[in-house]
Amino acid sequence: MMRIALFLLTNLAVMVVFGLVLSLTGIQSSSVQGLMIMALLFGFGGSFVSLLMSKWMALRSVGGEVIEQPRNERERWLVNTVATQARQAGIAMPQVAIYHAPDINAFATGARRDASLVAVSTGLLQNMSPDEAEAVIAHEISHIANGDMVTMTLIQGVVNTFVIFISRILAQLAAGFMGGNRDEGEESNGNPLIYFAVATVLELVFGILASIITMWFSRHREFHADAGSAKLVGREKMIAALQRLKTSYEPQEATSMMALCINGKSKSLSELFMTHPPLDKRIEALRTGEYLK
């Protein structure tokens, strides 16, 4: 279902835009306390914008279509399955959507537990057995029931705040050092062009490094969503679903969507930057019951 995904690209863009606003409004000349307040507002602002727009952005990204009225037996089964599991998990009925993609995948998103969305690919409906598909849907329902999207928003907000604040403090120091002379007693932050250039570069660099934190949480929540699915439909069904994912096409969803999907891309320079744990680790965690306690 959920997490850091729209977040990485969306928040990166939001922070750069907010960075420009900060520079144009002269916030670099403000006190440390003022800068922290602005960093908090803009840091959490980017996350909450992403959260509030998450359903619209996710559907637009994959070209998904919300099922208003089931048109065939497959759609009817999907809606009924989501409704049954939502009742079991104690959440309101999510919107249900289908999107065209050959890979086996699904995601859930939404600003609140009671205003969420579950979407599945046509590849999942065509290539998974009913038991396997039930397990994947239960995984997404668990993401919603666990409140992962809101938690991710708070984590991303904190990360954004520190990225903005530290980047601009260091940019002030750099601009003051390279900005030339100033009269005694005159307050100056140096060359504003240097300030903005340094702040932007540092935000990008620190943003990439900070993504390690959000990626870790994304992987951690996947284990808990797998465990939630096992509790809803049974451990063996979830294990079978993960084993089926190992034979799936490479996910076709955009990179910014990967953290929302059950089947993340398997290739990565390092597991530190993966949104999902390797499938073998997820299967092993279910077999040992590590997250089922």
Swiss-Prot record:
Transmembrane segments: 4-24, 34-54
Periplasmic side, ranges: 25-33
Location, primary (coarse class): membrane
Co-factor note (free text): Binds 1 zinc ion per subunit.
Changes after translation: Undergoes self-cleavage. This may not be physiological.
GO MF terms held by the record: metalloendopeptidase activity; zinc ion binding
This enzyme's EC code(s): 3.4.24.-
GO process annotations (BP): proteolysis; response to temperature stimulus
Effect of substituting F107A: Does not complement a double ftsH/htpX disruption mutant
Effect on the protein of changing H276F: Does not complement a double ftsH/htpX disruption mutant
GO cellular component term of the entry, any: plasma membrane
Pfam family, any one: Peptidase_M48
Recorded phenotype for the gene knockout or disruption: No visible phenotype, however one of HtpX or FtsH is essential for cell viability.
Enzyme class, broadest EC rank: hydrolase
Keywords, ordered alphabetically: Autocatalytic cleavage, Cell inner membrane, Cell membrane, Hydrolase, Membrane, Metal-binding, Metalloprotease, Protease, Stress response, Transmembrane, Transmembrane helix, Zinc
Membrane topology per record: Multi-pass membrane protein
Annotated localization: Cell inner membrane
Cofactor: Zn(2+)
Cytoplasmic side: 1-3, 55-293
Annotated positions binding Zn(2+): H139, H143, E222
Active site positions, chain numbering: E140
Family membership noted in the UniProt record: Belongs to the peptidase M48B family.
Function: Membrane-localized protease able to endoproteolytically degrade overproduced SecY but not YccA, another membrane protein. It seems to cleave SecY at specific cytoplasmic sites. Does not require ATP. Its natural substrate has not been identified. Probably plays a role in the quality control of integral membrane proteins.
The protein's name: Protease HtpX
Organism encoding this protein: Escherichia coli (strain K12)
Gene: htpX
